[in-house]
UniProtKB/Swiss-Prot annotation:
This is NHP2-like protein 1. Its main location: nucleus. Gene3D superfamilies: 3.30.1330.30. Changing G38K: Abolishes U4 snRNA-binding. The modification Phosphoserine is found at S122. GO terms for molecular function: ATPase binding; box C/D sno(s)RNA binding; RNA binding; U3 snoRNA binding; U4 snRNA binding; U4atac snRNA binding. Residues 96-128 are annotated as: Important for U4 snRNA-binding. The lineage of its organism: Eukaryota, Metazoa, Chordata, Craniata, Vertebrata. It is found in: Nucleus; Nucleus, Nucleolus. Ubiquitous. The keyword Cytoplasm does not apply. PANTHER family: RIBOSOMAL PROTEIN L7AE FAMILY MEMBER. Identified in the spliceosome B complex. Component of the U4/U6-U5 tri-snRNP complex composed of the U4, U6 and U5 snRNAs and at least PRPF3, PRPF4, PRPF6, PRPF8, PRPF31, SNRNP200, TXNL4A, WDR57, SNRNP40, DDX23, CD2BP2, PPIH, NHP2L1, EFTUD2, SART1 and USP39. Interacts with RAD17 and PRPF31. The complex formed by SNU13 and PRPF31 binds U4 snRNA. The complex formed by SNU13 and PRPF31 also binds U4atac snRNA, a characteristic component of specific, less abundant spliceosomal complexes. It comes from Homo sapiens (Human).
Amino acid sequence: MTEADVNPKAYPLADAHLTKKLLDLVQQSCNYKQLRKGANEATKTLNRGISEFIVMAADAEPLEIILHLPLLCEDKNVPYVFVRSKQALGRACGVSRPVIACSVTIKEGSQLKQQIQSIQQSIERLLV
């Protein structure tokens, strides 16, 4: 997927380095049961106020099926970011199917707290 193929509505788009860090953290949060997979589950975590950040796939077809999430994230003050591939996001989530959105959730005493805060700061720098 080249720069021209990416829908301009998929903003902010993570670069290759941030994408790798994001997908690694998504994979770890799946192991720690801190991950919700799918657009509907991500919406639920936002509404319940238990989302740390949202990761969405820029190649979702049509992209409009997940474009309600950035609006909800802005309302709830939750960082969000797009990655290029729904296939890669699906693999990181530990499922064999493509995943177009996922949410890393809040958990008391989580061992991933430092990594989550680091990623949140990286995402917020993209939004500026």
